[in-house]
Amino acid sequence: MSKLLGLFMKKLYKALIEVLYFIYRPVFYVLVVVDTTILGILTIALSFFDPTGNTVHYIGVFWSRLNLFLSGVRVRVHGKENIKKNQPYIVMMNHQSYYDVWAVIGYIPLQLRWVMKMELRKVPIFGLGCE
C-alpha cells in the first residue's frame, strides 16, 4: 500500500509542477520583456555619458543575472580564475537558447564586444542599434 501511495504522490507532485510551470511561463516572458525594455532604455540613455562602457556593462550583467534568476536557472562557472585581465579573448556562443548569452554576460568577467553578420544590420530596429 505504501508503494502505491508513493507512486501516487510522485504523479501528483509532477502534475502540480506542470501546472505551476504552465502558469509561470507566460509571467516569465512578460517579466523578461518588461525588464529588457526598462533596462534597454536606461542603457541607451546612460551610454551617451559613459565613454568607457562600464555602466552599460554593469547594467548588462544585472540584466543577465536577473533574467537567469527569474527563469530559475543557476549558473556555475568553472575555470573563471584562468581568465586574465587586460588580455583579449574571443568568446563564441552557439545560441541554442538565450541562456548562453545571459550566462556569458552575467558570469564571465569580461566586457564583451559583439560581432555579427552584415545581413543582421538590415533587421528593423535591431540593425539601427548596431550603428
Task: List PLM regions with ranges.
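N-terminal membrane-anchoring alpha-helices
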Residues: S2-R74
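Catalytic core of membrane glycerolipid acyltransferases/transacylases, capturing the structured
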Residues: L39-F62, L68-S71, H78, K85-E131
